[in-house]
Design a protein with these regions (language model features):
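Active-site-proximal loop/turn and secondary-structure-junction residues that shape catalytic pockets
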Residues: 11, 30-32, 61-63, 97-99, ...
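Hydrophobic, well-structured mid-protein blocks that either form specific transmembrane helices
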Residues: 87-142
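Glycine-rich phosphate-binding active-site loops on the catalytic face of alpha/beta enzymes
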Residues: 24-37, 82-98, 143-156, 193-215
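Alpha-helix-loop-beta-strand connector modules within alpha/beta enzyme cores
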Residues: 36-63, 102-124, 159-183
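C-terminal helical cap(s) of enzyme catalytic domains, especially alpha/beta-barrels
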Residues: 44, 159-168, 190-193, 207-219
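Catalytic cores of alpha/beta
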Residues: 10-21, 67-81, 126-141, 162-175, ...
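Active-site beta->alpha loop and helix N-cap motifs at the rims of alpha/beta catalytic domains
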Residues: 12-14, 23-25, 37, 43-104, ...
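Hydrophobic faces of well-ordered beta-strands that scaffold small-molecule active sites
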Residues: 3-7, 26-28, 47, 55-59, ...
Length: 219
């Protein structure tokens, strides 16, 4: 089976390692503790310079929910323009209304603004009230891909829903499983869902090289 693998890059080193390991693209994010927020101008610029594979920065001005104020939306539009300026390949977005439906109006504006860059709808999808309707809304908006764990904490638990989404999508949009995707379960997930694109953090923690630390500062 031939898969497309997207790996999250939270820093330049992880982006470089992912590229060397064979990742096909990077979803570029800051703040892993918040689930990923918009990377800085400098981060995007340096990643674009250093990477030959596709680069997809997330457009998410803060952690928390996906219901944004008008001022936050202005920030998102500005960040999309930066991604175009820096020659990224796509952006990753997601906005909802308070009732758990897709904010089609503002998502459409970002898709139009991003053109000719591609657009992925991120895991805001896993917070929607009606996933099958949300799928149709996102297709209407013009996104080329949805990242989802099938409305469950991890993609294996959501495999049945992911399979249903792929069936309904009928090749009109790519459904990309993410969350808990690893080398030891990707084949199982592919068989259960029919997916061919996958998203993984492939995260590991390394010790600091600092030789001095202040024991009083534990935050």
């Amino acid at each position: 089976m031939i898969f497309t693998l997207e790996v999250i890059g939270f820093n330049i080193e992880s982006c470089t390692i992912a590229q060397l390991a064979g990742a096909h693209r990077i979803e570029l994010c800051d703040n892993p503790g918040e689930g990923g927020t918009t990377p800085s101008y400098g981060f995007i610029k340096t990643a674009r310079k250093n990477l030959q594979i596709d680069l997809f920065p997330i457009i998410r001005p803060r952690g928390g929910d996906f219901l944004y104020f008008d001022e936050e939306f202005e920030v998102m539009k500005a960040d999309v323009k930066i991604c175009k300026e820096l020659e990224c390949d796509a952006v990753v977005i997601g906005m909802l209304y308070s009732d758990g439906t897709v904010d089609k109006k503002r998502c459409s504006q970002l898709v139009e603004l991003a053109y000719p860059l591609g657009v992925t709808f991120h895991r805001a999808f896993d917070r929607v009230a009606d996933p099958l309707k949300a799928l149709e809304d996102i297709i209407d908006v013009g996104c080329e891909r949805i990242l989802t764990s099938g409305l469950q904490p991890n993609a294996l638990d959501g495999a049945e829903m992911i399979a249903s989404l792929i069936k309904q999508a009928n090749e009109r949009i790519i459904i990309m499983p993410g969350s808990g995707v690893r080398s030891d379960n990707i084949i199982e997930l592919a068989k259960k869902t029919g997916a061919t694109e996958f998203h993984s953090s492939a995260r590991m923690y390394i010790n600091s090289n600092m030789t001095y630390t202040n024991a009083a500062m534990k935050e």
